[in-house]
Regions:
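Regular secondary-structure segments
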Residues: 9, 172-184
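Short, low-complexity disordered leader/linker segments with a strong preference
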Residues: 198-212
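Glycine-centered hinge/linker elements that transmit conformational signals in sensory
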Residues: 1-22, 67
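Short, charged, surface-exposed loops that flank catalytic or proteolytic processing sites
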Residues: 181-196
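Alpha-to-beta junction loops
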Residues: 34-44
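Short helix-initiation/N-cap motifs at beta->coil->alpha
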Residues: 20-34
C-alpha cells in the first residue's frame, strides 16, 4: 500500500497528472482524455471510446487495451462489477415488473438491448458474445478488446460481494483521501496508508461475517 500511494502521489507531484484530478467527478476522466490532458483512461465501460463513435478519425486513433501483466509476468484478473434490476416493495404493479425483468434477462433480448447501446456494457451471459459475431467483430477493435477482457478473460468480482462494508468504504473514497493527504497535507505515504487501513478496518468491523 505504501509503494502504491507513493507511486500515485509522486506521479501527481511531478506533473504527470492534471492538477484538477483531485476534484474530478465521475465523468471527468473521460473529459480529460478527450481534452488531451491524459493519454490513458482506466475505465470500466466503453464510454470514453463511444463518445467518439461518430468521429471515425478520432475513434480509430484511440486504442483499447486490457490490463498489463503483474510484476511476475502473470495476467491480472479484471475487477468485474454487475448491475442488476430491483423492484421496490411499494411498486404499484410488482407482478408486471417481474414479468418485464424476466423478459429483459432472456439472452436474446439482453443481447439486443446491449447492442443498441453499442456495447457500452457487457453481457452477464458469456453465450451471448459466443453466439453473436457482432461482439467479437475485429472491425471494431475497441469492442473486441473490451469483450475479450471482461467476458472471455479472467475476472474477479468487486470486494462488495464478500462484505457489504466494502460498499461503504468505497463510497467514503478512503484511498482517494489518502492520496490527497499526501499531496495536499504533506502526510507521509506510510501514515496515509495506516490511516486508510484503520478506517477500512473500522467500517468492516460493523459487518461481521460468521464463517460456516
Amino acid at each position: 500500500m505504501i509503494k502504491t500511494i507513493t507511486y500515485i502521489t509522486t506521479a501527481f507531484k511531478e506533473g504527470y497528472v492534471p492538477p484538477g484530478a483531485l476534484d474530478w467527478s465521475d465523468a471527468d476522466d473521460n473529459n480529460a482524455f478527450h481534452a488531451k490532458q491524459i493519454v490513458i483512461d482506466l475505465d470500466a465501460t466503453l464510454s470514453t471510446e463511444l463518445a467518439m463513435y461518430h468521429d471515425q478519425e478520432k475513434y480509430d486513433d484511440a486504442v483499447t487495451l486490457g490490463l498489463p501483466n503483474d510484476n511476475a509476468g502473470r495476467p491480472i484478473p479484471s475487477l468485474l462489477g454487475i448491475s442488476g434490476a430491483f423492484i421496490p416493495k411499494g411498486a404499484k404493479n410488482p407482478e408486471a415488473a417481474k414479468d418485464f425483468v424476466r423478459y429483459v434477462i432472456q439472452p436474446n433480448v439482453a443481447g439486443e438491448y446491449l447492442k443498441a447501446g453499442l456495447g457500452r456494457w457487457l453481457p452477464a451471459i458469456s453465450d451471448i458474445v459466443k453466439n453473436d459475431p457482432w461482439w467479437l467483430d475485429p472491425k471494431d477493435p475497441h469492442r473486441l478488446a473490451y469483450v475479450t477482457q471482461g467476458v472471455l478473460g479472467n475476472t474477479v468480482p468487486y470486494h462488495t460481494v464478500y462484505n457489504p462494508g466494502w460498499a461503504e468504504a468505497n463510497a467514503a473514497q478512503i484511498w482517494g483521501q489518502a492520496h490527497a493527504n499526501v499531496i495536499r497535507n504533506n502526510m507521509t505515504p506510510q501514515v496515509a496508508a495506516e490511516g486508510a487501513l484503520k478506517r477500512i478496518g473500522d467500517i468492516l468491523a460493523k459487518y461481521p461475517i460468521t464463517q460456516a
